[in-house]
Structure formats: C-alpha cells, structure tokens
C-alpha cells in the first residue's frame, strides 16, 4: 500500500505487491527474492525507507543474513547450467516477454519510484523508459554473441571461437535511478546466459522488486535472478563470494573504488561508474533560447540527482550576460512532491543529502561566489513541509579551487564559471578529474568539432545537454568517473558479461582410412 497522501490514486494502479510482507509481525517490510520465491528475511536488523517528500514510512528493508546471501548465490549457481544451455532464441523470447510487461506496467513502476525516490512522475517514467531501451536491445543479443571463424589455417585445421556466458554475475545499484540502472544490468546479463544476484539501493528497493516480479511473470526460470538487501556487508559479500564472476556497480566514488579494488583482488571483473562533474560550455553564437531551456532542464531536473546532470556551466565571453535570464527560468520551476500536479522538482533523497547541499552552497558563498538564486529556503505546500526539498540554486563567479566546484553536489545547484575562449573552457574541463559527460552549445560546426576532438570526457553532447547514448552504443564515462573492465550496455556491455572460447580443430582427410602417427615436434599451423 502506498503511504503518501498525494498519490493515493497510484496505490489503486499498483495493486498487490508480492515483495512486501502480508505477515502481521513483519508488516510493511520488503522481502528477498531467492530461487524464484519472495522470502521473508530472518534478520533482526531493518532499514527504514521513507518518502522523501513527506517522511512517511514506506517500507523496511532487511539487512540480509549471511545465510540468506549464500542461499541467493547458491540458487544462481545451481540455475546457471540449465540457463546457459537454454537456446539463445528462447532466452530472447523471454526477454521480449519481459520488455512487454515493463511497457505495460510503466505507470505502476513510476509510481513506486516517485513514492520512494521522490522524482516527479514524468521523470520517473523516463527512468523506466531509458531502462526499457536496454531491455529492448537485449532481445537481440544473439547478433552480439557471434563468434569468429577462420577456415583451413593449416591443411585440415580450422580455428573458431564461441562467445559464452561467465556464470553468476551481480549488480549493486544506486538510489537515483531505481529502474534504469537495474535494467542496465540484469536483463543483458541473463540474455547472455548468465544468472544474477541483484543488491538494489536500500533506500529505494521496491522498483527493483517489482521488476524481478515481472521477470518471473515473463518466464525467467527460478534462480536465474535473485535479490538480496543490505548495506556494506552485502556489498562485501558480493565482492568476496567465489561463485560471483562479475560485478556491475553505479554509485558514489568511495564505494565504487572499494568494490573495484576488493572485487578485482578476488579475481572478478568489475565495472564501476562513479561520481561526475558534468560541464556545459556556452559559446556566444549558440541559440540563446534553446540553450537556456536545455541548461534549466539538465541542471535542475530530478533535483540534480542524475549522474549526467549538468552541474557546472562554463560561459565563454559575452554569453555570461545570459545568466540573469537563466535564473528567471529557474525561479519559475515548481518544487513539490513528485506526484503533485505540475511539479518540476521533487525532494532530494534524504535529510543528510539536503544538509550537505546546503553546506556546499554556503561554502561557495564563503569562498567568494555569488548566490544569485538561493533554493535553501524554498517554500512548498504545507503537506510537504517535512520533505527534503532544495530549490534551484545558481552560484556565479565560481573558481576551480572552490569546494562547490571540486565536489559533486548531487542537488539542484548550478555553478557558473567564466572564461574568455573555447580553448580556456576545454583546458578547464580537462583539468577536472571527472569525465562522465559534457555538452557544448554553439552554432559553429568548427567549434563543435574542435570541442569533441579535444575534450577529455567520455560522452559529449553538441547542442544536447544530457548525452546518454542509446543502448546500441555504450555508456562511456571516463577518467575519474569510471574504473573497470568494460562499459555498460551496447557491445562493451555484452563483452563484459561474456567470455571467448577458441577452438582449434584438426580433422585430417587421411584419418578416414589410415592410421595416425604421433609427432613429438611443436605443432606449427599455417606452414602447409
């Protein structure tokens, strides 16, 4: 049952949630998903999930016991041989069924996201849709799992390769995209023939639970996808479990580097997408209205809690004169609960996050920046008076040494820097340690081409503020924003979840009717 008052209509849409307990003693708690069953945890430690717009309790998440985590990994390990041997065509049909169920239930998933994460309903639907795109691409995974063949490398000798699944894989997901990031991970992994253990963010568990419920309805066999809950203990268990072959992670810097170090030390593949400081470069010849609209949406949408949010704007030359108009646009944005009519920004995830954002805003002011739009005391409707709200905030005259520039704020705060030339903008951005995304706004093809060639950032938008690639490409954040063995989804995503087996085959013509003699010499292929 949905707990927040302003979305009572959404509770009628969602209906029964198998993943929430109906037991009187475990009322309002979230289950585990192990070997095809939603299981009540035997833990004595629970974490509260509260609606960030109202502070009302939504559910309690178990800190999975060691025995429960071991059971999840065992279920995945036991299910792997049969799932690996399921034909790629049948796996694709199941993923296609899953795609259809996600599409059918998009409104329900979005309502769950808004309740637990806080983002507006339209933004929550976008969260689901961007994940759905990866599921759609996973349906056609067979075309990316084709091996290679060279015939007759030597007389009667052929070499060919197979692309095969790894085994048990795991995913650790963040709070900011409760549907999209899990859907980046386990659908592609299982489409490739792997089995999976998912640990969703303990702050937003229910979207992941509903997604695995739909996967079961789509025909995913028992044990192929499993869900555990918890914090650091669950993360370390995944990093250490010998059965787990690969780990996908999206989240904060410290956690990402810990998972990469611990996982790789245990012989696992790890892909770790971490923090960002995404810059927009505004050239004076850009289309002014479109640029300001793009900056407003990309800086303040989702309350700045996107790993690809534009959190820094670099104004070249006279384009700095556009900043007052940008502030006027930001002032008009409505801050409210995510399901409230007309809401543009919802709350940030927690009171601690709100406090940190406030501190970073103040640090900028203390270090000499000007706060031309201050969202720290934003006024919201009385029903949201307890929520974690921060309004759009703009700091100008920011310098690279300031804390508000150096750190990822992860809130609706845009820091503005001024430079004289595009070259200076490129130098400034390349000096920043992060490399997730950037955008340039210009009407000059020459400037755009120079920017895309010289900028040391993994994803570049040209007159497009949030350049997240569609899934037939890959999400290619770089430098301080990524460590690991391969990027998410696309070709590199398939490569991450698979391994290559190469076969050298020797079927000699004379073996048909004659005996075979032994040779003690080193075999040399290609000589004959």
From Swiss-Prot:
Query: What residues sit in the active site?
Result: 307
List locations, semicolon-separated: Mitochondrion
Alphabetically ordered keywords of this record: Mitochondrion, NAD, Oxidoreductase, Transit peptide
Q: What's its EC?
A: 1.2.1.27
Q: Which Gene3D superfamilies match?
A: Aldehyde Dehydrogenase, Chain A, domain 1, Aldehyde Dehydrogenase, Chain A, domain 2
Cellular component terms per the entry's GO annotation: mitochondrion
What are the GO MF terms of this UniProt record? Answer: malonate-semialdehyde dehydrogenase (acetylating) activity; methylmalonate-semialdehyde dehydrogenase (acylating, NAD) activity
Q: According to its UniProt record, what is one Pfam family this protein matches? A: Aldedh
Q: Which CDD domains match?
A: ALDH_F6_MMSDH
User: Which processes are annotated in GO (biological process)?
Assistant: thymine catabolic process; valine catabolic process
**Record-annotated membrane-spanning stretches:** none
- Please list the residues that bind NAD(+): 175, 199, 202-203, 408
Catalysed reactions, as listed in the record:
2-methyl-3-oxopropanoate + NAD(+) + CoA + H2O = propanoyl-CoA + hydrogencarbonate + NADH + H(+); 3-oxopropanoate + NAD(+) + CoA + H2O = hydrogencarbonate + acetyl-CoA + NADH + H(+)
Q: Where is the transit peptide?
A: 1-26
Q: Does 4Fe-4S count among this protein's keywords?
A: no
Q: Which family does it belong to?
A: Belongs to the aldehyde dehydrogenase family.
Q: What does this protein do?
A: Probable malonate and methylmalonate semialdehyde dehydrogenase involved in the catabolism of valine, thymine, and compounds catabolized by way of beta-alanine, including uracil and cytidine.
Instruction: Name the PANTHER family on file.
Output: MALONATE-SEMIALDEHYDE DEHYDROGENASE (PTHR43866), METHYLMALONATE-SEMIALDEHYDE DEHYDROGENASE [ACYLATING], MITOCHONDRIAL (PTHR43866:SF3)
Q: How does it assemble?
A: Homotetramer.
The identity of this protein, by name, is: Probable methylmalonate-semialdehyde/malonate-semialdehyde dehydrogenase [acylating], mitochondrial
Q: Which organism is it from?
A: Dictyostelium discoideum (Social amoeba)
The organism that produces this protein has a lineage beginning with: Eukaryota, Amoebozoa, Evosea, Eumycetozoa, Dictyostelia
